[in-house]
From Swiss-Prot:
Cellular localisation: Apical cell membrane
Membrane topology: Lipid-anchor; GPI-anchor
Protein name: Placenta-expressed transcript 1 protein
A cellular-component GO term for this protein: apical plasma membrane
Top-level division of the source organism's lineage: Eukaryota
Glycosites: 57, 67, 126
PANTHER family, A to Z: PLACENTA-EXPRESSED TRANSCRIPT 1 PROTEIN
Modified how: N-glycosylated.
Lipid-conjugated positions (GPI-anchor amidated serine): 236
Length: 255
């Protein structure tokens, strides 16, 4: 018992020290992945393009220009301060970032893939890239664009071709109809005019001929009838007697 009482103060002191230093330990472990002391903005040409749409996911290929002095590339994709998507390859997690330690470089560019659900609005995702050189990092941001499938990409062209064909056909039909209508109207007008003129001429000629013929026939008939009556009158016996009587009376009066 005396020995236990002697150890209790030391045990309590150890527990207090452990509680006091535990936050610093966790902070040290949490921040141990930070490989840089200073950060500078950069305009490095970072390329992030959607290369493949598989099922319900879209895979983006991220290309980062590097050289022999680059020791690590840190990538972070966040939306509303929360990590989005998954990264490929061998990396270490650091908070909401992934760290790619570059030990050997075979080319002047570092590539990795980032996969995200196709339903995710990538235009609202902040993709940040850190390039670490001698504990100094340059930071760049990339604007992501949604992947357009080939069917969607080819739709405007087919619609344009269909619309162009439809418009051309409609214009051709309209022109043909207009020309045909004008031609029909012209032909109808010409035919109507010709028929009307011909009919009018024929009617006028017929009427004139009929009237002239009727008048001529009537006058000729009347004249012939009058002459015939006169001849008949003169040639009758009564007319002869009257003629003789008239000659006798005239001779008496004269002589």
């Amino acid at each position: 018992m005396p020995a236990l009482r002697t150890l209790l103060p030391h045990l309590g002191l150890f527990l207090c020290l452990a509680l006091c230093f535990s936050p610093s330990f966790s902070l040290s472990n949490n921040e141990s992945c930070i490989l840089y002391d200073q950060v500078y903005p950069s305009d490095n040409l970072i390329n992030a393009s959607a290369e493949e749409v598989s099922g319900e996911n879209t895979t983006y290929t991220v290309t980062v220009p590097v050289n022999d002095s680059v020791s690590a590339v840190i990538l972070k994709a966040e939306k509303d301060n929360k990590p989005v998507g998954t990264w490929s390859g061998a990396y270490e997690k650091c908070n909401n970032s992934v760290v790619y330690n570059l030990t050997s470089l075979n080319n002047s560019a570092f590539q990795t893939n980032w996969t995200v659900p196709s339903s995710e609005d990538v235009t609202k995702v902040n993709l940040t890239i850190f390039i670490v050189i001698n504990r100094t990092a340059t930071v760049s941001s990339v604007k992501l664009e949604p992947k357009e499938t080939s069917s969607l990409a080819s739709t405007p062209e087919s619609q344009t071709s269909a619309m162009t064909t439809a418009m051309t056909s409609a214009m051709t039909t309209a022109k043909t109809t207009a020309v045909a209508t004008n031609s029909s109207t012209d032909v109808t007008s010409d035919n109507s005019t010709a028929v009307t003129t011909a009919n009018s001429t024929a009617v006028t000629t017929a009427n004139s001929t009929a009237v002239t013929t009727a008048k001529t026939t009537t006058m000729t008939t009347a004249t012939t009838t009058a002459k015939s009556l006169a001849i008949r009158t003169l040639c009758s016996p009564l007319a002869g007697a009257l003629h003789i009587l008239l000659v006798f009376l005239i001779s008496k009066l004269l002589f």
